[in-house]
């Protein structure tokens, strides 16, 4: 896998020698996270079959340039696909290109194909054939998440459409709403459509496409729905991918694959981002974000994976945070753990949150930063990333600061399953107390829609653990160190080492009960620790997917850096809308960057790609 930048868009080339190439077009929003790892496998499987395959992150998504508030984002997505096709032809020497779209990426690929010459084949995997249907699905997801987390914020406030990490201005939303494969004229020769088992039939669409003279193979792919599960449960639909390779057939006559891939770094408003490889045998992938307009401040920040999500994070929050830190003069590394995102697996398995490997991955990230920077190292983690940051800090004395966001577990017991833990995790005690007098809750209870037995058991268990936490010194005197005592001792050890901690929990996050069980009601013992800044963020969901929540997080981090590391804020933490930034597309610089081929690495000098300014 080789990282590249194409007109400001981050891409990964799975190189091969065939004359027929494939551009893989992913989905948007939360679906882009969940299906990311599967797309890596798709690219690898196509390359093994001889097809050079290019995964592209659209402009304003993933690790690409661009922001939510820029105009013409829909047009930018289509331009990203068009640029990827031209790049694959010019760089890899392919004579024909297949567009392979996943979910709403299928409709975007079809739209791009309607404008391109020489794209005569389309592969549509679990396709959402219209933007309107996709937006409706996102609204349902957003409402479900808001109900679960009791989070606040409008899905549509008259200016912005925001649904669990997908944030669109109205012109972009309207353009996406009008997208419909059935209304496009497609100058392609043939199409493979692999639908989900429970999808609404697209027989009418298939008939329309065949009326255009297109050879359409329309099949139900039994395993394609695995793409839509949460990233830690998402599975690679191997049968579907094998079907794609079989349908494509021969990759064509082999050509030379020792090509110069071009760009290695991305420059954005005095910020430079460079894909890097690190860890044992360079098996871990990351992006180093550096300020270029002034000297690098200390400290530096490491941002490990959250769950099995790729490094750009839910709502692209990690990218925004890294670039904001660079505006403060602070370098950062966001990285994928083993078996997550673009990183290779450590044991041949998919990335497993809360495994010991995650602790080692954090230390590998610290190795990388410590070898390049002299300042203090801060590790910023969310959920399982916070757990691994905490665990790594206990053993790695090079870690000087921790930013722990919605930490769910201080202790992970061997044999526990994340899926089981999530299914058996109930809401905070405070949530149930606040809703005890809510008539709607009682109506749901009478209809049997509330798991009253499970809730009662969870509350009773919490009460017992709260009492045990208060009585921990007496229990420890008789039975030896308890789990509560161990965690308290660990926090004390970090404090004695002067590890500065910012501990943030969303207002209804189950982590509130976790902290109460170890440090008393709402963590009162933790609040007394002089090395800990403890904050809650009312109205935010678990992943801080809302734009306002991410802005508030920036404010809290700015205060933490100012108070604990004497870092002066160079810009306002809540960044004003910067409409029109796309008027000048980013320049991609020539640098030496790692190139991955299996586990082997080599450094290659890459040529300059200088994008011309584009009108907004």
Give each language-model segment a name:
Residues 57-72, 335-352:
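Glycine-rich "HGGG/HGxG" loop immediately N-terminal to the catalytic nucleophile
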Residues 232-269, 540-543, 547-596, 601-616:
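Catalytic active-site module of serine/aspartate enzymes centered on a nucleophile-bearing elbow/loop
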Residues 28, 52, 57-62, 128, ...:
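Short beta-to-alpha linker loops that shape the active-site pocket of alpha/beta-hydrolase fold enzymes
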Residues 1-17, 250-296, 546:
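N-terminal cap/lid segment of alpha/beta-hydrolase-fold proteins
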Residues 3-6, 72, 116-241, 245, ...:
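The alpha/beta-hydrolase serine catalytic core
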Residues 70-90, 350-371:
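Alpha/beta-hydrolase active-site loop
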Residues 16-57, 292-334:
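Short, surface-exposed "cap/lid" segments of acyl-processing enzymes
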Residues 100-109, 380-389:
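Gly/Ala-rich beta-loop-alpha elbow adjacent to hydrolase catalytic centers
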């Amino acid at each position: 896998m080789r990282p590249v930048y194409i007109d400001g868009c981050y891409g990964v080339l799975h190189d091969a020698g065939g004359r027929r190439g494939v551009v893989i077009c992913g989905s948007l929003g939360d679906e882009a996270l969940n299906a990311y790892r599967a797309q890596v496998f798709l690219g690898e499987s196509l390359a093994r079959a001889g097809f050079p395959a290019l995964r592209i992150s659209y402009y304003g998504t993933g690790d690409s340039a661009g922001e939510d508030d820029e105009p013409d984002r829909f047009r930018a997505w289509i331009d990203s696909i068009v640029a990827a096709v031209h790049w694959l032809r010019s760089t890899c020497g392919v004579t024909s290109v297949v567009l392979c779209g996943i979910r709403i990426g299928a409709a975007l690929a079809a739209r791009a194909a309607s404008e391109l010459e020489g794209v005569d084949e389309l592969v549509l995997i679990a396709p959402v054939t219209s933007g309107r249907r996709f937006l409706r699905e996102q609204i349902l997801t957003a409402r479900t998440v808001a109900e679960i987390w009791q989070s606040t914020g409008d899905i549509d406030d008259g200016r912005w459409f925001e649904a669990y990490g997908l944030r669109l201005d109205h012109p972009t939303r309207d353009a996406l709403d009008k997208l419909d494969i059935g209304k496009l004229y497609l100058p392609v020769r043939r199409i493979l459509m692999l639908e989900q088992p429970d999808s609404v039939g697209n027989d009418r669409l298939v008939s329309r496409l065949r009326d255009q003279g297109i050879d359409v193979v329309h099949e139900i792919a039994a395993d394609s729905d695995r793409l839509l599960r949460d990233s830690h449960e998402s599975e690679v639909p191997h049968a579907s991918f094998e079907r794609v390779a079989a349908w494509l057939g021969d990759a064509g006559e082999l050509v030379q694959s020792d090509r110069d891939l071009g760009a290695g770094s991305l420059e954005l408003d005095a910020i430079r981002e460079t894909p890097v490889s690190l860890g044992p045998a360079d098996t871990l992938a990351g992006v180093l974000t550096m300020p270029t307009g002034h000297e690098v401040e200390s400290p530096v920040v490491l941002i490990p994976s959250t769950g099995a999500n790729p490094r750009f994070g839910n709502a692209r929050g990690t990218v925004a945070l890294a670039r904001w830190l660079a505006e403060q003069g602070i370098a950062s590394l966001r990285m994928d753990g083993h078996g997550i995102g673009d990183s290779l697996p450590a044991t041949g398995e998919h990335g497993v949150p809360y495994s010991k490997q995650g602790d080692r991955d954090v230390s590998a990230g610290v190795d990388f930063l410590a070898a390049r920077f002299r300042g203090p190292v801060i590790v910023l983690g969310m959920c399982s990333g916070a757990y691994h940051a905490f665990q790594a800090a206990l053993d790695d004395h090079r870690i000087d600061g921790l930013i722990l966001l919605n930490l769910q577990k201080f202790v992970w017991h061997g044999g526990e399953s994340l899926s089981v833990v999530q299914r058996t995790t109930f809401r905070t005690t405070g949530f149930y107390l606040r809703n005890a007098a809510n008539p709607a809750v009682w109506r749901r209870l009478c209809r049997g829609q509330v798991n009253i037995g499970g809730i009662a058991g969870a509350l009773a268990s919490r009460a017992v653990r709260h009492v045990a936490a208060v009585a921990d010194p007496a229990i420890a005197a008789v039975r030896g160190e308890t789990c509560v005592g161990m965690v308290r001792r660990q926090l004390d050890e970090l404090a004695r080492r002067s590890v500065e901690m910012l501990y943030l929990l969303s207002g209804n996050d189950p982590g509130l009960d976790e902290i109460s069980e170890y440090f008393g009601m709402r963590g009162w013992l933790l609040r007394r620790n002089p090395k800990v800044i403890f904050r809650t963020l009312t109205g935010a969901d678990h992943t801080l997917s809302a734009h306002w929540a991410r802005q508030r997080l920036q404010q809290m981090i700015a205060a933490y850096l100012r108070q604990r590391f004497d870092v002066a804020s160079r810009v306002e933490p809540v960044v004003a809308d910067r409409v029109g930034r796309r008027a000048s597309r980013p320049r991609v610089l020539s640098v030496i960057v790692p190139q991955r081929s299996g586990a082997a690495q080599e450094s290659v000098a890459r040529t300059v790609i200088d994008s011309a300014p584009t009108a907004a």
